[in-house]
Structure formats: structure tokens, C-alpha cells
Amino acid sequence: LITHKHADHTGELRAFPNAKIYASREECKADELQYPNVVPVDFTDGPYANFEKSQKIAEGVYFIEAKGHTTGNSIVIAEDGGLYYMIHGDVTYTDEALYANKLSVVFEDIGAARKTLDSVREFIGTHPTVYLSTHTPLGYENLEAKAAVDLNDPPESKPVGEILFGQASGKYVCSVCGYVYDPAEHNGVAFEDLPDDWKCPRCRQGRDKFNRA
């Protein structure tokens, strides 16, 4: 299920030649996704909760029209165990922006982006939602902890100016998917000593996409 056309979300679709790949019809046209295993979605199943258009993909899995970040942007909601897991792509780049009600820094339609974020926040306010961001480690932490968002209780964040860069942890974070490379989990091998062709285990990006934690 592809939320939007940007390369950091679609760049390795070729790795799944036998999978059905769902994307909104608008994104399929924009990204020229015209292959036998690509399924354009038209959101013909009517409203889902407070969202106006949706498509049921499987039992408990829904594709939701959520324009703004791109003109054909979508979100995925998976229902399980009384929780609603929201894979939102880049409706917000960080969880802090969700809590602060701030738009993504990238959008193709600012009016649609505002409407989508308002709808996302309204949904979260009435459904126990695990918010799965893709550009911050919080997405994976939320998933592992099955932590539902409480918009009235934002997580504590530390201003950049207060971070003690001198106390290096040896950890590096992938700027694309949020994967944390911890030498302690890799036989003590420092990130700097990894081979040049090393790839992120999660998104397969190169070392140049990593920043010091």
C-alpha cells in the first residue's frame, strides 16, 4: 500500500515483483506506475469514520484518500485488537508536528493538506490510534509499544540547543526510515568501520543517509 509517489516511499517497489501494489489512481498517473501488479485505487467504498473517501483492501485494512502532501496522497488504517494503526506517509514528518497541529513542510496543495491534518486529528481524538510516522524513530517505537496517541499529552522533546553533542553514543540514525544503528547490536562494529557498500537493513539506503544520534 503506497501512501504517495515520492521516491523514499516508492524507490524499491521493484523488490516486490510478485506483490499487488496499491496506490491512488492519481499517484499512479503522476509516477507512471503502469505495471501488471499495480492496482490503481479510486476510493469507491464511501466514507470511513470522518474521512470522506475510502477503499477496503482487506478485512480490517482501509486505504483512505488524504490529499495535500501530494495531490494523490493516501493513508492506511489497519484495525487490530481495538487499536487503529495509521500509516500516514508524510501527513506530518514528525509526531511533534501532529501534536502542535502543524502541516508537513512539503505539500502540493496547502488547502487539502490542512483539511487532511484536521481530519487525522479528529479521527485520533475519537479512536485509539497508533500513529506510524516514517521519518522519525517514534513511528517504530509507537508500533512496538502499541502506544495510542493522546493529543493532550505530547511526548517530551528536547530543543536542539540542549543536546550534548560531546557525549557521542556511537549510534547513527537513518534519515529516511528512522532505523538506529547501534554498535552494541552489531558485535561492537563502529558505524565508521562499516564497508562502503553497507545498506540500511530496513530501507536499503546507503551510509550517506545516516546521521549521528
Model-derived regions, located:
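Active-site metal-binding motif and surrounding structural segment of the metallo-beta-lactamase
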Residues: 1-23
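Short linker/helix segments within small regulatory modules
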Residues: 186-198
